[in-house]
Amino acid sequence: MPAVLGFEGSANKIGVGVVRDGKVLANPRRTYVTPPGTGFLPGDTARHHRAVILDLLQEALTESGLTSQDIDCIAYTKGPGMGAPLVSVAVVARTVAQLWNKPLVGVNHCIGHIEMGRLITGATSPTVLYVSGGNTQVIAYSEHRYRIFGETIDIAVGNCLDRFARVLKISNDPSPGYNIEQMAKRGKKLVELPYTVKGMDVSFSGILSFIEDVAHRMLATGECTPEDLCFSLQETVFAMLVEITERAMAHCGSQEALIVGGVGCNVRLQEMMATMCQERGARLFATDERFCIDNGAMIAQAGWEMFRAGHRTPLSDSGVTQRYRTDEVEVTWRD
């Protein structure tokens, strides 16, 4: 019964998780929160992660009831992500692996999301909508790879939402996306915004540029409220995501859809995806914020699968890769 300790820190979340044989034993997490109207810089984010990671490690061990002797493998996020935070976490993972004399496994962040989603929901072979601050992809498993059937051709959907939040100076606590979601519930008017889908790919830079350009003028003239803009942006970008997911499901002949990534815990997105799945006679699988948002347990779970399949990351190859494609990884742990 191998137990794996996972470190995640590719963006503004830092987490340490423990997984043993399909059970999440611990999953503490911290978030680097910046003032309204601002984003998070790599150097500042890395300093935050370094300041709290050892406390999180101790918290994870205490919560799991395990000691270093009980851990069989150390997993860490190899990429993709922001360089400085990734490096900070990788250094700690390497150090712990050497101090405890444990094997090390570098995990693709995107695959961590997928494996956690499969574990928690029980989805067997879904078409995956992976939506976060750094990634937007439609993925399906085929011949030992998680194949990307569609993706953003510019910025991620979460990045679009976050940057819009800066325009209105919406709070980043607990996250700009969550606060947009709450404001959107009070929106009454649907403002027409650019809608860009190309096959199974999407583009969000145009809709962001448009809404950045018109937001203050429309608010100043009373054409709409901030809540209306949040509602309109959500409805438009989520409709784009539902469309490309349905197209991928039709292409793959899939009867399951799984939403993963930080944006995936948005209830409105889940509602729209559920409607599409219901009309297709398919099932929707999604998780809550404990497992959708970046966390250490998802890295531990993917690391657990990889460890059991014989994967090991030598110290000489234990760096990070900021641009690490989902389909670069050979998925040897699945049939």
Swiss-Prot record:
Gene3D superfamilies: 3.30.420.40. GO terms for biological process: tRNA modification; tRNA threonylcarbamoyladenosine modification. Widely expressed at low level. Expressed in heart, placenta, liver, kidney, lung, brain, skeletal muscle and pancreas. Keywords: Acyltransferase, Cytoplasm, Disease variant, Epilepsy, Intellectual disability, Metal-binding, Nucleus, Transferase, tRNA processing. Pfam families: TsaD. Its EC number is 2.3.1.234. GO terms for molecular function: metal ion binding; N(6)-L-threonylcarbamoyladenine synthase activity. Changing residue 198 to R: In GAMOS3; reduced formation of a threonylcarbamoyl group on adenosine at position 37 (t(6)A37) in tRNAs. A divalent metal cation binds at residues 109, 113, 130, 294. Substrate binds at residues 130-134, 162, 177, 181, 266. It is found in: Cytoplasm; Nucleus. Changing residue 14 to F: In GAMOS3; strongly reduced formation of a threonylcarbamoyl group on adenosine at position 37 (t(6)A37) in tRNAs. It catalyses: L-threonylcarbamoyladenylate + adenosine(37) in tRNA = N(6)-L-threonylcarbamoyladenosine(37) in tRNA + AMP + H(+). Changing residue 280 to L: In GAMOS3; reduced formation of a threonylcarbamoyl group on adenosine at position 37 (t(6)A37) in tRNAs. Its main location: cytoplasm. Its cofactor is a divalent metal cation. Changing residue 247 to Q: In GAMOS3; reduced formation of a threonylcarbamoyl group on adenosine at position 37 (t(6)A37) in tRNAs. Binds 1 divalent metal cation per subunit. InterPro entries: ATPase_NBD, Gcp-like_dom, KAE1/TsaD, Kae1_archaea_euk, Peptidase_M22_CS. GO terms for cellular component: cytoplasm; cytosol; EKC/KEOPS complex; nucleoplasm; nucleus. Belongs to the KAE1 / TsaD family. NCBIfam families: arch_KAE1, gcp_kae1. Component of the EKC/KEOPS complex composed of at least GON7, TP53RK, TPRKB, OSGEP and LAGE3; the whole complex dimerizes. Interacts with PRAME. This is tRNA N6-adenosine threonylcarbamoyltransferase.
